From Swiss-Prot:
One of its GO terms (cellular component) is Swr1 complex. Belongs to the SWC7 family. The keyword Cell membrane does not apply. Component of the SWR1 chromatin remodeling complex. One of its GO terms (biological process) is chromatin remodeling. It comes from Candida glabrata (strain ATCC 2001 / BCRC 20586 / JCM 3761 / NBRC 0622 / NRRL Y-65 / CBS 138). It is found in: Nucleus. Signal peptide: none annotated. Pfam families: SWC7. This is SWR1-complex protein 7.
Length: 129
């Protein structure tokens, strides 16, 4: 899996970790501008450690554990520069991007995964009859 091929659920979790870190930084230092951090997030060793120690990321995107802080910065910058379809680039923040991937993930669940689970459950139920 290359860096640009992370699924929406993986991107969403990384963005959530990143957002939590930005909020924490602003709470510690009132001089920081949260609006600026949402467009140009601080990605440091703490963010990297949180990503690398996350069990979900370990299972679903093991390559995250091999990323450096610099690679993670590049990755997030890439996602921000890709933006969101039909949304002006200047309106893209880590929150709007997370919302986009959240919505995308919900659609994936509704359109692909839930029908598959229902079908498999029905097959199992039919076998038990």
């Amino acid at each position: 899996m290359t860096e640009s091929e992370y699924s929406s659920k993986v991107r969403l979790l990384i963005l959530q970790i990143l957002l939590q870190h930005q909020q924490s930084l602003v709470m510690k230092n009132k001089d920081l501008d949260i609006k600026k951090l949402l467009v140009e997030p601080v990605i440091d060793i703490e963010v990297m450690n949180n990503c690398q120690s996350n069990t979900f990321l370990k299972l679903n995107a093991p390559t995250v554990s091999k990323l450096t802080v610099r690679n993670l910065r590049f990755l997030v910058e890439e996602w921000l520069s890709e933006g969101i379809p039909n949304v002006p680039k200047e309106e893209t923040t880590i929150i709007t991007l997370a919302n986009y991937y959240y919505s995308k993930r919900i659609n994936e669940l509704e359109e692909k995964e839930l029908p598959t689970i229902r079908s498999e459950a029905k097959e199992l139920f039919d076998r038990l009859k």
